[in-house]
Amino acid sequence: MSSHRPELHITAQHGVLEAPAGALFTGEQWHVFHQYRSQPDVKKNNWGHVVSADTPFNWAHRDDVLSAEAPEVQVRAGSVVAPRCGDEAELFFTSVTDEGPSIHRALLTNLSGPQSDVRREGSVVDAPVLGLDKPQDFRSPCVVPGWADEDDRSEGHGGWLMLAVAGPMSAPELVMLSSHDQQSWTLDGPLAFHGDSGLAHHPILVSPRIIRLRDEVDGHVYDVLIVTVEADGVDLSGYLVGTLRGCDFWVKTPFTQMDFGHDFTRPRNTNTVRGVTYGNNERYDAALIFGLMNGVGRLDNPATHESLRAEGWANCLSLPRLTTLQGGLLFQTPTPGLTSAIPHTAHARMWSGLIDAQEGSVTVTLLDNATGRIAATITHSGHHLQLDRSMNPLHAEDSPAEAYLISADTDSLTIIVDGSTVEVFADGGVIAMASRVYFEGICGGFDVTAEGGASILRYFEVAGEDV
């Protein structure tokens, strides 16, 4: 019997998970909020809330924190921040009525308790609030409790910053807003790029996030802008590295694809409680990123998903990724604690190895225990990584996912299989791939081969209790 639902990844209990809405780590608990619909043919959606203690792998569902209230027709994704100590968080979300979207705020109290309380506090960003003559359709807020002292970026963070989307769906623009108290906001203007952004041929940018990381190579603190490009009905998520000053983003690294698998889009960073989650000297060392695994993005059709047909749910979030900045590039690896969590599952598996693939290739084959057939293959050939699921009858029309690797002293490969999800990290995390792979049963194991002069230097494997 198959079970497509993963055990370590976040899914909606039923219905369609549409987007990660916000994430918060308090130092003791992980809180992830997600936008979902209880049924695929229902327009109204909610903000779900899941919690995990210590590590982000053992999720418990809490009551929904937001649902559409008349005249709203939808509540969409935004940000969750905890600017101060205490058992509460601020929710910034997109409220949609028949007249269009605007950005609203709510206060969530009793955050760590079994049942949180939510108090809506109304619109904070819309045309009337900002004194504008006509609607601007503000949506998708990324809120940072403070941003930068430009004279000392390592200190930074005084006041509030909001990065949002405005304008029509066909021609959106990214805009910057600022506030001293998170309630009254000033529209500072559209975000402008200086230098080669790599986005000249991608006019539709959505789902923006901005974080700050210290580059491990030069020691400087940079701003990392994460965006999703909508092109021909398909999402492509990536990042730019540079320096944000007011509404101007000075580019160091142009738009770079963040994940090369079949099913990763609209990433969200995990916010923390300043001075509580991490010390001030650690706060720019790494970020924790979740992405949505749903195929093409906003225009994805959940009715085509085998998990919805067989089990009544569609889509999940990726595993959280520990994300660092090295030489202007993001490196993504599994969050610590995963190898300890997998043995407590029923069916999850992981294979991780150091390999030498400067000549030849190493291929890891995923086997379906119900049929004995190949469900997917992952091949590392030194400068090239491929995830191929086309031999699987449930993915027969799909082209392989491919990426080119930069030169590395040592090649490495980590593969996690959890239900119908497969996530791959290569060469220390310089390339990541997230793809759905459906099994008629479950993943029955890894068959690893080295060819053409390649070799496996060392490896380890962990698996759930029932495999």
Label each residue range with its predicted role:
Residues 217-218, 231, 243-467:
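Beta-rich accessory regions
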Residues 1-139, 145-200, 214-260, 278-284, ...:
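Beta-rich carbohydrate-recognition and catalytic domains
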